[in-house]
Amino acid sequence: MGMTSDSIADLLTRIRNALMAEHLYVDVEHSKMREAIVKILKHKGFVAHYLVKEENRKRAMRVFLQYSDDRKPVIHQLKRVSKPSRRVYVSAAKIPYVFGNMGISVLSTSQGVMEGSLARSKNIGGELLCLVW
């Protein structure tokens, strides 16, 4: 698995494709940033769980996907906002409310990667990585 120039977009695409194919899990290359994003998705119930595994001195992450009782993905959309070619930064006041608060935004802040509502409550902005609903 080669790292693309945008590993976050790659992570979101892999999750999106795995959900469309109704897979139970998806394997992705591990990075601290990717794990931080997946950890938030797990905390908010968008993924079931994940584990980090070591293979041939390379770290991989297995993300177990979450489906509703009628086997529909609980994630409707994963949208990359900030991109390497066009970074998007927001102040705390400009952190979006996603899909009538059913969704989340994920930010990279001076205090680490966190969910938008947490950044808003701490009154800190940052790079708007992605939206999930």
Swiss-Prot record:
Domain of life, source organism: Bacteria
Record PROSITE patterns: RIBOSOMAL_S8 (PS00053)
Biological process (GO), any one: translation
NCBIfam families: PRK00136.1
Keywords: Ribonucleoprotein, Ribosomal protein, RNA-binding, rRNA-binding
Cysteine pairings via disulfide bonds: none
GO MF entries: rRNA binding; structural constituent of ribosome
GO cellular component: ribonucleoprotein complex; ribosome
Keyword RNA-binding: yes
Cited Gene3D superfamilies: 3.30.1370.30, 3.30.1490.10
HAMAP family: Ribosomal_uS8_B
Keyword RNA-binding: yes
Descriptive protein name: Small ribosomal subunit protein uS8
Pfam families on file: Ribosomal_S8
General function of this protein: One of the primary rRNA binding proteins, it binds directly to 16S rRNA central domain where it helps coordinate assembly of the platform of the 30S subunit.
Species this protein is from: Chlamydia pneumoniae
Gene that produces this protein: rpsH
Subunit structure, as described in the record: Part of the 30S ribosomal subunit. Contacts proteins S5 and S12.
